[in-house]
Amino acid sequence: MERKEKDHLNLVVIGHVDSGKSTTTGHLIYKLGGIDERTLAKLEEKALELNKASFKYAFVLDNLKAEQERGITINCALRQFDTPSRSYTIIDAPGHKDFIKNMITGTSQADAAVLIIAAKKGEFEDGFSREGSTKDHALLAYTMGIKQAIVAINKMDTIDYDEERFNEIVENVSDHLGKIGYKKENVKYIPISGFDGDNMLEQSENLPWYKGPTLTEALDEFKVPKRPIKKPLRVPIQDVYKIAGIGTVPVGRVETGVLKRGMEVQFTTGATSEVKSLEAHHNKLEEAEPGLNVGFNVRLEAKEIKAGHVCGDAKNDPPKNAESFIAQVIVMNHPGHIKAGYQPVLDIHTAHVATKFKTLLSKNEARTGKLIEEAPKFLKNGESGIVELVPTKPLCVEEFSKYAALGRFVIRDMKRTVAVGVIQEVIHKKETKKKASKR
């Protein structure tokens, strides 16, 4: 019962490929008792078999066979661990450029971020270059609503715990995070070794010059966001499982409202069903409040629900598909001009859908929203505008002012983040309700 009492926080761990995200996260989970010695010994054996001895902690999270062989995190791995005062769900997001889509899904579910940066000469520079993913990840996290972060400067053991190098990295990173919009007081910088465990739970003797908090102390200083319990239910679906003996189990994070056992829920397709049971981290629940990642059993065929769909209360403002929507976008990284007819991929909550720029309504000042030009011919890097977007597949989105997590998005093309935006108005499709299929 103790877990119920604790504040719960969702953390996303982000950073460039090979910065040591999975190792740091795995080691932290081990130190906090989230995995036993026997399991770790098995993982160590497996790592040795694959000639990757230094990956034993990473394997705590890298559970897909393909990931263990390549040593890269592909899906967003979810794990739970506890400190004496808090309960955390940790989302280890992929750092590899090809897997940025999965990273966005992970980030959209988090309350706070831990950005892991490798201190090693060349590695920091690689991650922070135009081709590296560190800057992209930090921007995506901010756009997805994460306003508090820890920057863990990792692999300090490889640079002899050099204070000067630490300060040089802090200066570079804090300057960049400030430009994105992060407030200085909401970001902490901590020197660590994810493999050796320096500064994770207790102050390290190898870092006598560092007087700040350890990684776990800094985690416990994160503010727990106010949970929007009173709003209608919204659960963006991350995965759908078909489990023998149970049936269809969609999994997602409750963003607003309360999901209850026995409630009649409706998905964006119009399909409805009663919630037969729900659980989080193998604990059965009667209800789940915002911030909780849950799996719940519904009497629907697995093919009727997909990742990216949204679940709501059938009797209270159920989620609907958007015909089109009006949004403010800021163009960040497009090699040319964005014009009407452009069709990139839109990433919003857990959905990734090709979306067309139907009309460019205006060009505006990014900070103030002041009108610069009506019906512009194009938008280019650094410019902001109001546009009408049309999704090419069924998609549930909401106004940012009503449901923040379902109202902010990232636009991707050519494996890069082209633009970010927030939704101001949604034009809905007229839908008919479909009853749960008979079992």
UniProtKB/Swiss-Prot annotation:
Region (G2): 71-75
CDD domains: EF1_alpha, EF1_alpha_II, EF1_alpha_III
Keyword Protein biosynthesis: yes
A cellular-component GO term for this protein: cytoplasm
Residues annotated to bind GTP: 15-22, 92-96, 154-157
Gene Ontology molecular function: any one: translation elongation factor activity
Keyword terms, alphabetized: Cytoplasm, Elongation factor, GTP-binding, Nucleotide-binding, Protein biosynthesis
PROSITE patterns cross-referenced by the UniProt entry: G_TR_1, G_TR_2
Localization per record: Cytoplasm
Classification via InterPro entries: EFTu-like_2 (IPR004161), G_TR_CS (IPR031157), GTP-eEF1A_C (IPR054696), P-loop_NTPase (IPR027417), T_Tr_GTP-bd_dom (IPR000795), TRAFAC_GTPase_members (IPR050100), Transl_B-barrel_sf (IPR009000), Transl_elong_EF1A/Init_IF2_C (IPR009001)
Region (G1): 15-22
Pfam families the UniProt entry points to: GTP-eEF1A_C (PF22594), GTP_EFTU (PF00009), GTP_EFTU_D2 (PF03144)
Residue ranges, annotated region (G3): 92-95
Region (G5) location: 193-195
Domain tr-type G intervals: 6-229
Region of interest: G4: 154-157
Family: Belongs to the TRAFAC class translation factor GTPase superfamily. Classic translation factor GTPase family. EF-Tu/EF-1A subfamily.
Record's function text: This protein promotes the GTP-dependent binding of aminoacyl-tRNA to the A-site of ribosomes during protein biosynthesis.
NCBIfam families: EF-1_alpha (TIGR00483), PRK12317.1 (NF008969)
Alphabetical list of PANTHER family matching this protein: TRANSLATION FACTOR
Name of this chain's protein: Elongation factor 1-alpha 2
UniProt source species: Euplotes crassus
Gene: EFA2
